[in-house]
Amino acid sequence: MVQATLRLESQWPASPAFGWALAPLEVSVLLSDDEAVQALNAQYRGKDKPTNILSFAMEEEADDAMPMPIMAGEPRLLGDLILAYQTVQREAAEQDKPFDQHLTHLLVHGTLHLLGYDHERSEDEAQQQEAREIAILAQLGLPNPYL
């Protein structure tokens, strides 16, 4: 397992893709294996299978909450992202995408969950989250992952 705490201060917070000013953000990232992620997925989501990424926010959002802007100021710990290495690697190969691009997409996807987005809440929110992902990845010079 590989664990790191990332501080997102460079291109991402200044990106117009967000639509608001962000304080420096900290995210703990754990690159784990399918077995460990499957156990966490079963425990916290009731799904006994591995998934590519799990997001655990430091602050819980209400079920119907929309993402709220984080205003500039002190660094804020958003939460934890846990990725299943084998699943991410397999998906990248199946989708004929470079591993690093797929991994970056999942990190953006998971971070948006930490910011309050939830594509499972409604179709409208799924479209909003997908549009944000595409815009952020474009700012990083990466292609639309949904094509």
UniProtKB/Swiss-Prot annotation:
EC number: 3.1.-.-
InterPro entries cross-referenced by the UniProt entry: MetalPrtase_cat_dom_sf_prd, YbeY, YbeY_CS
GO BP of this protein: rRNA processing
GO molecular function, one term: metalloendopeptidase activity
Cofactor descriptive note: Binds 1 zinc ion.
Origin superkingdom: Bacteria
Disulfide-bonded cysteines: none
Principal EC category: hydrolase
Subcellular location: Cytoplasm
SUPFAM superfamilies: Metalloproteases ('zincins'), catalytic domain
Gene3D superfamilies per record: Metalloproteases ('zincins'), catalytic domain
GO cellular component: cytoplasm
Cofactor(s) the protein needs: Zn(2+)
Binding sites annotated in the UniProt record for Zn(2+): H109, H113, H119
Family: Belongs to the endoribonuclease YbeY family.
Its biological purpose: Single strand-specific metallo-endoribonuclease involved in late-stage 70S ribosome quality control and in maturation of the 3' terminus of the 16S rRNA.
Protein name (Swiss-Prot/TrEMBL): Endoribonuclease YbeY
Organism whose genome encodes this protein: Magnetococcus marinus (strain ATCC BAA-1437 / JCM 17883 / MC-1)
